[in-house]
Amino acid sequence: MTPPDKLHLIERAAERLIRDGAVPAGLGAGAQPGTDLAPPPAAALPPPLPPPLPSAPDPAASAPAVAPRRMIDLALMVAGGLADGDGRSRIAEEFRLVQHQILRSAFGADSAGDHANLVMVTSSRPNEGKTFTALNLAASIARRGDHRVLLVDADAKHGSLSDLLGLNDQPGLLEIAADPALDLGVCLIGTPFATLSVLPVGRQRGHRGDLFASNSMLRLVQALGDRYTDRLVVLDVAPCLSTSDPAALAAAVGQVLFVVEAEKTQRDEVEAALDLIQTCPTITLLLNKVKMSTSHSFGAYSYAYSS
């Protein structure tokens, strides 16, 4: 935990929110049925990311410059939680605000540095809306059209993005991490958006979940960022207090988008989760499922972040 004389990440974010006079944005997530909250992992920080091994092959190097072979149907994406991004709807405008902050940190003057194009989306516990957020952030940027996006399912739990999009029988992230010689291009799935591709979690998640904390997975994630420097790589990762995966992957990414469910997630849960991922240089907090009255206008919405 942080020393008494040093404000916690969430306290710094709250101070910024109050100072700016803003109200956190409310994104209406389609929550999945509840699951039990697993006990928090040990409070110890994950070890520093080891340097890449010179002899290890680049697991993303074999990806061909061709379009993905399979396409996800738009209706299936909508059923999986894709919101209407057209027009001036509140949710579309809110995701445009979120994407502006993420893209500025990734490619703009406020770049977060190395691997800033790698964005991990997570939360404290299940059903706070992280998968909804990851899917709609990726789609919002793809609709904009000036940046390519790779949406990666890095959650080995059942009910993940791959399940929602009908990709649970497809090879993906886990297979590539286990076998760097596997062609990444074979695993990429196309979408109705020309600039958006999806990498499923893979078929081995039932018995290869340990790969998320392995050096091969960390090398793979960073290789994706190094190879696709012109695109944003959005990783939908399991909740911090359900598994140690986010703590391990936080050292490999340049940004974390941390989803907090309004009026439900406890402060101590948020603090415990943030302590586990503070190895990432830039952490953005997004308050989700806020109940707004009809008198609120779009201009009152914002979100807090800490870095």
Model features per residue range: what roles?
Residues 1-95, 211, 268-307:
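C-terminal lobe/tail of nucleotide-utilizing enzymes
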Residues 6, 87-94, 98, 130-133, ...:
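Helical mechanochemical/support elements of P-loop NTPase systems and associated helical scaffolds
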Residues 16, 20, 101-105, 109, ...:
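Conserved, well-folded catalytic cores of nucleic-acid-processing
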Residues 75-114, 170, 174-176, 181-186, ...:
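Extended, non-globular alpha-helical segments
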Residues 92-156, 163:
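Walker A/P-loop phosphate-binding motif and the immediately C-terminal alpha-helix
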Residues 126, 158, 203-206:
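A short, flexible beta-alpha/helix-coil linker loop
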